């Protein structure tokens, strides 16, 4: 069991899209490493989910804009007392590399959209039970290829998405690092905080799993509300009336 459980809440749709993509990338990488063909099907489905999610908005452009904004903030720290300049310059060089790789790409996943077999498989997997050997024998044959062949194919299909993954990961890492973790007590299971006009992009909440609660979060540019509830799998979540200790971080970078 995890020592703490982390919950994140986005303040805008751009960060919500980032978190969804991060989740899909994590799922894709996890199942692509496995050897079982049935688990590789989850990896392939995650690949198609990534394509769907990236088609809904200009994720590439948004990530590039965020990285440029974060780069300018880091440049402003040059010669600043207390800042490790060698580490700062290394970060800026790494950021330039990531930005260049992402900017050099065309439309995210375009090569995958032009792969006729993957397009056909994408359509079959969208149908419940549609990828059986009856409906798509070529996919059944692929699933029965050696593990090394399937893994190589998955890595090949992943490759066009790696610049986006690296850019997205860097943007989210810098955003998360901008927050300061604080100990909070939710009296009678509830907590609210005024934001005093400061613009935040992400709220992070850490909860001890032994408490048996989870946060239900809502927020706008003026205030954050957190209400802790329990869930036993049988009925809808029930709000708790006891005090709950947790940690919170507001991220604005």
Curated annotation (Swiss-Prot):
Superkingdom classification of source: Bacteria
Localisation: Cytoplasm
Gene Ontology cellular component terms for the protein in this record: cell division site; cytoplasm
GO biological process: division septum assembly; FtsZ-dependent cytokinesis
Keyword Glycosyltransferase: no
Keyword terms of this UniProt record: Cell cycle, Cell division, Cytoplasm, Septation
Family per similarity comment: Belongs to the ZapD family.
Function summary: Cell division factor that enhances FtsZ-ring assembly. Directly interacts with FtsZ and promotes bundling of FtsZ protofilaments, with a reduction in FtsZ GTPase activity.
Oligomer and partners: Interacts with FtsZ.
NCBIfam families xref list: PRK05287.1-4 (NF003656)
Protein name in UniProt: Cell division protein ZapD
